[in-house]
């Protein structure tokens, strides 16, 4: 099978079917696609349980259970008729070479963005967001980050490849403006002086959705936004299949409502990460991720109107 790298793909974690049964296009750069889905089967930057390299395959597989619905509830229209989306398969890299993965992912993203495409990416561990941010910042300039997670990922431990350090590195590289960025669902220790607005899980759960959304919009304003969703933002009751689960998180219903609430933001790139199917039960984590990913596409399609 031809792949992003023009190589034969003998990966044990890739697959030959597209998200939501969407068309597969391994050379999407010259296509007429508006949004391109890329799988990133990488988990070498994990600090807890590994296995998120199998996340893209799990998300795609369970997404077939969502493909039947035409006018999806509650949107009442079919995203596929408004938005041209293709799945370009998984990034191919030398397994064990984190630097090669990072460089190839950034190059792939830069090429897509230069061709006028937008990206929805499936991790893999959360480190994959950093090369994606580098590519998006080259194209759009400094961005705001809207970040759903149980952890802030702003730790300065000096490790180059670590899924807990991206949002320490990204502001230092000038990729994002933390004062215009929001981290949602946090419920672990973090440095309160890093500049981000942190809406921790207790307050997000206790406040109304409209109240939280209004604060996010006020902070972000009209900046270009990169949206990243670590599945461990959800409570383990809704997403047990992840490397570093933390109780006390968001419900899947609240997460969907928050995504719908921020649809008016200028979202220029999106990802969903940290699905580790080995720890899942009845595919509920993969289903949550696939549904959230589909919701991300719907908020883009809604902007186009009829």
Curated annotation (Swiss-Prot):
One of its GO terms (biological process) is spermidine biosynthetic process. Keywords: Hydrolase, Manganese, Metal-binding, Polyamine biosynthesis, Putrescine biosynthesis, Spermidine biosynthesis. GO terms for molecular function: agmatinase activity; manganese ion binding. Its cofactor is Mn(2+). Pathway: Amine and polyamine biosynthesis; putrescine biosynthesis via agmatine pathway; putrescine from agmatine: step 1/1. It catalyses: agmatine + H2O = urea + putrescine. The keyword NADP does not apply. Catalyzes the formation of putrescine from agmatine. This is Agmatinase. It comes from Cronobacter sakazakii (strain ATCC BAA-894). The lineage of its organism: Bacteria, Pseudomonadati, Pseudomonadota, Gammaproteobacteria, Enterobacterales. The gene is speB.
